[in-house]
Curated annotation (Swiss-Prot):
InterPro entries the record matches: MFS (IPR011701), MFS_dom (IPR020846), MFS_trans_sf (IPR036259), Multidrug-R (IPR004734)
Organism: Candida albicans (Yeast)
Molecular-function GO terms, alphabetical: fluconazole transmembrane transporter activity; xenobiotic transmembrane transporter activity
Name listed for the protein in its UniProt record: Benomyl/methotrexate resistance protein
PANTHER family: FLUCONAZOLE RESISTANCE PROTEIN 1, MAJOR FACILITATOR SUPERFAMILY
Keywords, sorted A to Z: Antibiotic resistance, Membrane, Transmembrane, Transmembrane helix, Transport
Domain of life: Eukaryota
Family in the record: Belongs to the major facilitator superfamily. CAR1 family.
Length: 564
């Protein structure tokens, strides 16, 4: 691990301040550091200095790389938000920049191994909290007995957890894009609260308290889901961003399947309460590790801190940063508009966003519905034990991993290499893969439903579930990247915040009616066939959405006031 990771970690920052800058000092605080002339108090700008800074600039340069962005969670965007090569002088202010294009303090200049380790940390963080969504579901029967409640009420803690991490990005995403807060402090503080919340969740003795605690748990679990993609974008070059996002999102997509796997073992060996003690342990381990090893990567925050250090060293109050200037121009009214109103406005007014939100919400909901459907067949028909049921969820993980190994080389061929050759690439380059994903999703649902009967082997439904998961992964990756490439950087955060909220609210209610849907359509020979077919026919119709984007994408973007 590089020294920089410890220095810029949460513990490193605290130690730096408590020691009054004695430990974990930065390069500009070294005695042999040569202060650039422009930061000196008696420096006078010349005509050689460009004295204007345009923070509203949204064009993409001739390299195909954008100059800034705002990102959200599950915010899979292909817009680079870390290019801070703005001009150095703004009137009487001196704006701090990186020390050259190859400045090692710029996260985008880190060596590949450091970037890989950072992405691993974000992915592990995402997995360690995201598995908490469905971790208790194998113990629902025991929960129903302990609290004297029905199945629908026992499913509410899952519903409220999902709603919680849909609401969270409305609060935490704007904070993570503010230079004062940055990414790491948000991750660490909310993760600490998530860990603490697992203790009363494991001890609570009534369903009302459990529901409240689960909502709060989802709320504080949301930053890594909402901002993880933005953190990846901080360190990965624009042309490699889809690959970096795919690597991170493996943790995001596989996490909910790991939950029931571990939850089934813990429920059998102990009780449903131990699923939350497990979450406390695994997220607590993540908290301790990240406190020491997760560095800050948001460019505006790093330059904001650098500006403070340079002001202290030089005594020059003219030194400032882009983030400080933006904060001085942002009113509370504008903050409320950006945070609360604009995501709703874009969802309603933008057909592209609305259609993608509906499609992704449906796909997301189907994955959560599996937590209700698997027990109907594997326990009710094939008489699997609870632990054996938990292992069936690994079929979803296998399907996602296979899809990732196919997706990454394809996207490098279709996106990364053309960008490096300085060829023009349009957002619609992602859509053919989304169409393939839609076909796999629909096919998997029919395979799962009609192979899950009383006479066939149980491997058939698992193959169908893996196929469904493969399609879902491809749809997530491509449509998120399509949105990230289609909209102006200023609106990216709102676009993804709307998607977070929309898909989470829709997905949260699916488990409530999932079991009744399949029970009412079941036949003695085919217990889940017609329920799966209903979902299959819906997703078959929805394949028309990416087809529409492929055929009319440029026209739709041309009509939008938010799109590039």
């Amino acid at each position: 691990m590089h020294y920089r990771f410890l220095r810029d970690s949460f513990v490193g920052r605290v130690t730096y301040h408590l020691s009054k800058h004695k430990y974990f000092a930065h390069p500009e605080e070294a005695k042999n550091y040569i202060i650039p002339e422009k930061y000196l108090a008696d420096y006078k700008p010349t005509l050689a200095d460009d004295t204007s800074i345009n923070f509203e600039k949204e064009e993409i340069d001739n390299q195909g790389e954008p100059n800034s962005s705002q990102s959200s969670s599950s915010n899979n965007t292909i817009v680079d938000n870390n290019n801070n090569n703005n001009n150095d002088v703004d009137g009487d202010k001196i704006v701090v920049t990186w020390d050259g294009d190859d400045d090692p303090e710029n996260p985008q200049n880190w060596p590949t191994l450091q970037k890989a380790f950072f992405i691993f940390q974000i992915s592990f963080l995402t997995t360690s909290v995201y598995m908490g969504s469905a971790v208790y579901t194998p113990g629902i029967e025991e929960l129903m007995h302990d609290f004297g409640i029905g199945r629908v009420v026992a499913t509410l803690p899952l519903t409220l957890f999902v709603i919680g991490y849909g609401v969270g990005p409305l609060v935490f995403s704007p904070m993570s894009e503010n230079a004062i807060f940055g990414r790491t402090s948000i991750y660490i503080i909310t993760l600490f609260l998530f860990v603490i919340l697992q203790i009363p969740t494991a001890l609570v003795n009534n369903i009302a308290g459990l529901c409240i605690l689960r909502f709060l748990g989802g709320f504080f679990a949301s930053p890594c889901l909402a901002t993880g993609g933005a953190s990846v974008a901080d360190v990965v070059k624009f042309w490699n961003l889809p690959v970096g996002l795919a690597a991170w999102s493996l943790g995001a997509v596989c996490g909910p399947s790991f939950g029931p796997f571990f939850g089934s073992i813990l429920t059998v060996k102990a009780s449903w309460r131990w699923t939350f003690w497990f979450m406390c342990i695994i997220s607590g381990f993540s908290f301790v590790m990240l406190c020491f090893t997760l560095p800050e990567t948001f460019g505006k925050t790093l330059l904001y801190r650098k500006a403070k250090r340079l002001r202290a060293i030089t005594g020059n109050d003219r030194i400032t940063s882009e983030g400080e200037i933006e904060n001085s121009k942002m009113t509370s009214h504008e903050l409320i508009i950006d945070t609360l109103w604009r995501p709703l406005e874009i969802t309603v007014m933008e057909p592209v966003v609305l259609l993608i939100n509906i499609y992704i919400a449906m796909v997301y909901s189907i994955l959560y519905l599996f937590f209700e459907v698997f027990p109907i067949y594997f326990v009710g028909v094939k008489h699997f034990t609870l632990v054996e049921l938990g292992t069936t969820y690994m079929s979803i993980v296998i399907g996602i991993v296979i899809a990732a190994f196919i997706y990454i080389p394809v996207i490098r061929q279709k996106f990364t290499k053309p960008i490096l050759r300085q060829e023009q690439v349009f957002p619609e380059v992602f859509i053919p893969i989304a169409i393939v994903g839609g076909i796999l999703l629909t096919s998997g649902l029919f395979i799962f439903g009609w192979s899950a009967n009383r006479t066939t082997h149980w491997v058939g439904p698992l193959f169908g579930a893996a196929t469904t998961a493969s399609g879902a992964f491809l749809i997530f990756q491509t449509l998120f990247n399509f949105m990230g490439a289609s909209f102006k950087p200023h609106y990216i955060a709102s676009v993804f915040a709307s998607n977070d909220l929309f898909r989470s609210v829709i997905a949260s209610v699916f488990p409530l009616f999932g079991a009744p849907l399949f029970d009412n359509l079941a036949t003695p020979e085919y217990p889940v066939a017609w329920g799966s077919s209903v979902l299959g026919f819906i997703t078959l119709v929805m394949i028309a959405i990416p087809v529409l984007f492929y055929l009319n994408g440029p026209k739709l973007r041309a009509r939008s006031k938010y799109a590039n």
